[in-house]
């Protein structure tokens, strides 16, 4: 479960912050 979320989150969170 978490493994599937970590991937997208690592790509989305930095993208939103920038």
Curated annotation (Swiss-Prot):
The keyword Secreted applies. Keywords: Amidation, Antimicrobial, Secreted. The modification Lysine amide is found at residue 18. Expressed by the venom gland. GO terms for cellular component: extracellular region. The keyword Hydrolase does not apply. It is found in: Secreted. May have antimicrobial properties, like most ant linear peptides. This is U1-poneritoxin-Da2a.
């Amino acid at each position: 479960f978490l493994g599937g979320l970590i991937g997208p989150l690592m790509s989305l969170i930095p993208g939103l912050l920038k």
